[in-house]
C-alpha cells in the first residue's frame, strides 16, 4: 500500500464533521493566566514578547494605524501558535490549508485598502501611477499596479502555506527514511536522525518567522494606507 505524503494536510473529521475549529481554539490553552498581582515567569515572558513585537511593528504607524495594534498582535500569536501546534505528534496544522490562509489574508488586506481609499483617496489612487511616468506607459503601468495590488492577499496566503507545508513534507520524508534505514544500517540511520532533529529545530524557527512575516506584511499594507 502506497503512503500518501499529503495525508497529514487533509482536514481531520469525526463522523463527517470537521474538527478544525476545535484545533484552532486549542492554542489558547497554551497561554497560562494568573489571578495574582505579581505574574509568574511564564506570564512575564509572554508580556515581554508581546511588548517587544508591538514596539517593532507599530513604531512606524501614526495614531490611526495604531488602532490596529490589538488585531495584529492577536494575529501573530494565533499564527505562531497554530504553526507550532503542527509540530507536535499526531496533530494537524491549520495553516497548511490555503483556504484558511486566504480567509485571513483577504479581509485584512481589504480592510487596509478600504481604509486608504476612505481616508486618503488621492494618495491611494496615486499608487497606481508612479511619479514621472512617460505618457505612453501610463495605461500599462496602471494595469500592472492594479494586478500587483490584487495579488497581495494571494501572495500572503501562498507564502505561509508553501513554507509550512514544505517543512512538514521534509520532516515526513526524512522521518520515513530514518525508520526504513534503522533496519539496514544503524550508522546511516543515526545520521538521518540527526538531520531530522536539526530540521525539527529549524521548523520551530520557521513557524515563528512565518507568523512574523505574515503580520509584518499586513502592517506594511496598513502603513501604506494610513
Swiss-Prot record:
Its main location: mitochondrion. GO terms for cellular component: mitochondrial inner membrane; proton-transporting ATP synthase complex. It is found in: Mitochondrion inner membrane. GO terms for biological process: proton motive force-driven ATP synthesis; proton motive force-driven mitochondrial ATP synthesis; proton transmembrane transport. It catalyses: H(+)(in) = H(+)(out). The chain crosses the membrane at residues 6-26, 68-88, 97-117, 138-158, 164-184, 193-213. It is a multi-pass membrane protein. Keywords: ATP synthesis, CF(0), Hydrogen ion transport, Ion transport, Membrane, Mitochondrion, Mitochondrion inner membrane, Transmembrane, Transmembrane helix, Transport. Subunit a, of the mitochondrial membrane ATP synthase complex (F(1)F(0) ATP synthase or Complex V) that produces ATP from ADP in the presence of a proton gradient across the membrane which is generated by electron transport complexes of the respiratory chain. ATP synthase complex consist of a soluble F(1) head domain - the catalytic core - and a membrane F(1) domain - the membrane proton channel. These two domains are linked by a central stalk rotating inside the F(1) region and a stationary peripheral stalk. Belongs to the ATPase A chain family. This is ATP synthase F(0) complex subunit a. The gene is MT-ATP6.
Amino acid at each position: 500500500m502506497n503512503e500518501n505524503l499529503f495525508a497529514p494536510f487533509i482536514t481531520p473529521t469525526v463522523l463527517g464533521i470537521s474538527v478544525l475549529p476545535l484545533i484552532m481554539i486549542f492554542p489558547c490553552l497554551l497561554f497560562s493566566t494568573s489571578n495574582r498581582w505579581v505574574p509568574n515567569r511564564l506570564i512575564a515572558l509572554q508580556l515581554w514578547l508581546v511588548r517587544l513585537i508591538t514596539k517593532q511593528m507599530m513604531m512606524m504607524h501614526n495614531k490611526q494605524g495604531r488602532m490596529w495594534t490589538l488585531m495584529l498582535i492577536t494575529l501573530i500569536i494565533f499564527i505562531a501558535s497554530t504553526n507550532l501546534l503542527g509540530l507536535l505528534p499526531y496533530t494537524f496544522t491549520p495553516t497548511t490549508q490555503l483556504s484558511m490562509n486566504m480567509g485571513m489574508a483577504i479581509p485584512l488586506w481589504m480592510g487596509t485598502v478600504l481604509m486608504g481609499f476612505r481616508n486618503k483617496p488621492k494618495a491611494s489612487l496615486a499608487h497606481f501611477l508612479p511619479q514621472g511616468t512617460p505618457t505612453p506607459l501610463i495605461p500599462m503601468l496602471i494595469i500592472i499596479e492594479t494586478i500587483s495590488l490584487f495579488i497581495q492577499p494571494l501572495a500572503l496566503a501562498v507564502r505561509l502555506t508553501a513554507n509550512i507545508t514544505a517543512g512538514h513534507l521534509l520532516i515526513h520524508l526524512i522521518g520515513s527514511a530514518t525508520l526504513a534505514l534503522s533496519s539496514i544500517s544503524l550508522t546511516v540511520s543515526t545520521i538521518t536522525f540527526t538531520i531530522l532533529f536539526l530540521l525539527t529545530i529549524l521548523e520551530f524557527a520557521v513557524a515563528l518567522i512565518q507568523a512574523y512575516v505574515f503580520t509584518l506584511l499586513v502592517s506594511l499594507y496598513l502603513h501604506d494606507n494610513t
